[in-house]
């Protein structure tokens, strides 16, 4: 790992995404932006007239959304690779403003549709010529009690940029303005600490390096704690306001009901994970023993327990491994992955000013998905490649097999395809290294960590979100102190039976960007539970299971998300898949103990 982040221009072109596939340059984007704004003004002429020709109004509504998508995506992606680039940030700000203008100009549309007679709406939804829009109309009718009169909808739309402010402030603070102290390396040198490099340091064999990085991150966030608490409070208060304005009982209801996910799924997840905390404690106790520690601290949780085996993988070797591990998905699937590798889909390496983390952006029907990585040469980041490409392939199949109004799959299933890729690749590696005790132990450790960080950790995050929003809904203040206390107590619940829960872990909630997209992190946990089952089916049943899985990938939002998963044979309306996945965690732990004995 380089001690200092490279500048973007120092990274070879084959490891950067190519946004010219969207627009050849910023001038073309400017022209497209002008066209979208003109189309928005034209669409505004429908105000008060939707009832005259509702079918045509629906078509033009979706056409405008499709026209705007590349304008927004180009600006967003352009800004992600250098948050310090004022030109790119200017484009992103203008795209955001465009979104608010369009939302305002189009805000009358759904209320006017909903003012139509129910029988007419049902007739339009049943019209074969309007089949592309039937899912939209079904959801619209279902959301009728939560749609406001046109003038009120317009006011909410005008709040768009204000509502986005907490997330934007958080991003600017953490990606641009915030800097971390250097990490002291064992040889006496120092290395630059960023959110992008933290994952490497926290896995270090050197406990001093781990503690230096952990304290550097947590204490720096803590020094901005009051600011971040105020920022997060703004985000939560907006969630509560939006929910109440739309006549939902809670902010959680407002997030989950439109997705057709019962809140019992959320509650089942927390309940089942709580029941499995003793197994987590068993795993943590084994970690403590294998690491030979008198005390297991929070900065000891990520380093591999198998110290005499190292799987260091360059990006190119990692991608080869992903292709090999995902062969069960079929040759057409692999062909698209190869295209992604060389076709300008992926931005690979960390660089100065680049956003941390990883994501896939799959909204561009006429181009291809884009993937942002911050690749370090380790096994974890190899799985990240498989994970993000799982998102991309889900988008690709949905976009290919569904019309635009039905192609945007639900948040609830958004993590299933990505995590299924990880699980399938893991099974391949466990089989490949079955006779290599060191490698097998290392991989089992990684699999256990995937469960700990994806099921237990994300469920803890989900529980924190529920606590924070419930506090706000009950009129309790969200301050640095109250939020940090709640987060610390959750860490004690999940880890305290075995771990020394360091005081500054109370600051960790401050660095989680997903909290600004409320009630989302739980889908990582439910997604893994579904994905483990899907991967088992694909590997055991072969082609028939792959066909069923492809139906799920291709479903988009044509059917409700629970039903989409049922196409692949998984029923997430019951706690059974969660319980079964946690059973896999227990079995994997037993296997790991046997290997390490």
Predicted region positions:
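Long, K/E/R/D-enriched contiguous segments that form extended
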Residues: 293-328, 394, 448, 452-454, ...
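Catalytic Zn2+-binding segment of zinc metalloproteases
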Residues: 390-404
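A well-structured
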Residues: 1-308, 595-597
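C-terminal, non-catalytic "cap/extension" segments appended to globular domains
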Residues: 10-13, 20, 24, 109-116, ...
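Short pre-active-site segment immediately N-terminal to the catalytic Zn-binding motif
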Residues: 369-386
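Post-HExxH zinc-binding segment in Zn-dependent metallohydrolases
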Residues: 409-437, 447-449, 453, 527
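Flexible, glycine/threonine-enriched loop-and-boundary segments that flank and lead into catalytic domains
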Residues: 342-369, 492, 496-518
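Auxiliary, metal-adjacent structural segments of Zn-dependent hydrolase domains
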Residues: 300, 306-366, 378-379
């Amino acid at each position: 790992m380089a001690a200092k982040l490279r500048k973007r221009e120092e990274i070879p072109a084959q490891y950067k995404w190519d946004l010219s596939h969207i627009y050849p340059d910023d001038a073309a984007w400017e022209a497209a932006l002008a066209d979208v704004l003109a189309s928005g003004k034209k669409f505004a002429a429908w105000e008060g007239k939707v009832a005259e020709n509702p079918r045509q109004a629906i078509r033009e509504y979706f056409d405008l959304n499709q026209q705007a998508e590349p304008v927004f995506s180009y600006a967003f992606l352009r800004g992600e690779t250098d948050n310090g680039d004022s030109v790119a940030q200017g484009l992103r700000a203008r795209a955001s403003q465009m979104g608010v203008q369009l939302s305002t100009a189009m805000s009358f549309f759904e209320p006017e549709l909903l003012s139509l007679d129910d029988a007419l709406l049902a007739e339009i939804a049943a019209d074969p010529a309007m089949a592309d829009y039937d899912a939209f109309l079904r959801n619209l009718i279902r959301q009728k009690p939560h749609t406001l009169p046109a003038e009120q909808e317009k006011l909410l739309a005008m709040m768009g940029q204000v509502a986005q402010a907490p997330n934007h402030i958080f991003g600017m603070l953490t990606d641009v303005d915030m800097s971390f102290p250097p990490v002291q390396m064992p040889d006496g040198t120092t290395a630059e600490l960023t959110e992008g490099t933290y994952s490497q340091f926290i896995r270090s064999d050197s406990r001093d390096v781990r503690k230096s990085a952990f304290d550097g991150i947590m204490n720096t966030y803590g020094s901005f704690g009051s600011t971040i608490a105020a920022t997060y409070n703004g985000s939560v208060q907006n969630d509560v306001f939006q929910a109440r304005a739309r006549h939902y009982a809670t902010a959680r209801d407002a997030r989950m009901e439109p997705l057709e996910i019962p809140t019992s799924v959320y509650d089942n997840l927390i309940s089942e994970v709580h029941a499995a905390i003793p197994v987590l404690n068993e795993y943590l106790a084994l970690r403590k023993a294998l690491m030979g520690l008198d005390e297991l601290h929070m900065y000891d949780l990520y380093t591999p327990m198998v110290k005499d085996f190292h799987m260091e993988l360059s990006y190119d070797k990692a991608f080869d491994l992903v292709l090999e591990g995902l062969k069960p998905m079929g040759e057409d699937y692999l062909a698209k992955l190869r295209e992604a590798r060389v076709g300008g889909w992926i931005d690979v390496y960390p660089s100065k000013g680049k956003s941390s983390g990883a994501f896939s952006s799959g909204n561009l029907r006429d181009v291809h998905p884009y993937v942002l990585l911050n690749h370090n040469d380790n096994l974890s980041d190899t799985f990240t490649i498989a994970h993000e490409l799982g998102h991309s392939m889900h988008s690709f199949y949905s976009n290919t097999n569904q019309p635009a109004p039905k192609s945007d799959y639900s948040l609830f299933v958004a993590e299933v395809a990505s995590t299924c890729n990880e699980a399938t690749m893991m099974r391949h590696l466990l089989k490949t290294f079955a006779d290599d005790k060191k490698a097998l132990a290392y991989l089992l450790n990684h699999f256990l960590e995937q469960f700990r960080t994806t099921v237990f950790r994300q469920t803890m995050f989900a529980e924190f979100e529920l606590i924070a929003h419930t506090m706000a809904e009950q009129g309790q203040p969200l301050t640095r102190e109250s939020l940090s206390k709640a987060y610390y107590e959750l860490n004690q619940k999940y880890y305290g039976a075995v771990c020394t829960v360091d005081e500054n872990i109370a600051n960790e909630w401050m660095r989680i960007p997903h909290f600004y997209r409320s009630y989302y992190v739980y889908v990582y946990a439910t997604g893994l539970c579904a994905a483990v089952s899907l991967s088992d089916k694909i590997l055991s049943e072969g082609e028939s299971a792959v066909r069923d899985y492809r139906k799920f990938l291709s479903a988009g939002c044509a059917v409700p998300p629970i039903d989409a998963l049922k196409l692949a044979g998984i029923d997430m309306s019951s706690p059974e898949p969660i319980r079964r996945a946690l059973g896999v965690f227990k079995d994997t732990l037993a296997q790991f103990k046997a290997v390490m004995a």
